[in-house]
């Protein structure tokens, strides 16, 4: 888990996505508006973050809402500081 988490955190765009999700849950479209990139590019970053367990998603009708998985973030920080 830690290896995937650190790999996911190595990209500045993904770190910024996590910062935004720390403020509030968002859709891929809302996140894409914060960057100069397409929704598919943001979705790729979100998939990487999901695979690392740093982000969770939940479908609400037509939308998928992404959230920061604070438990995994705390575990990752604990492992790093450990």
Predicted feature residues:
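Conserved segment of winged-helix/HTH DNA-binding domains
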Residues: 1-2, 64-82
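Short helix-coil-helix linker/hinge
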Residues: 8-13, 70-71
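Short helix-to-turn junction characteristic of helix-turn-helix DNA-binding domains
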Residues: 9, 21-24
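Pre-recognition alpha-helix immediately N-terminal to the DNA-recognition helix
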Residues: 15-17
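Base-recognition residues in the alpha-helical recognition helix of bacterial helix-turn-helix
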Residues: 19, 43-47, 62
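Helix-turn-helix DNA-binding motif, specifically the short coil turn and the N-cap/start of the second
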Residues: 27, 38-41
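A short acidic, leucine-rich amphipathic alpha-helix
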Residues: 31-32
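Beta-hairpin "wing" of winged helix-turn-helix
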Residues: 50-60, 67
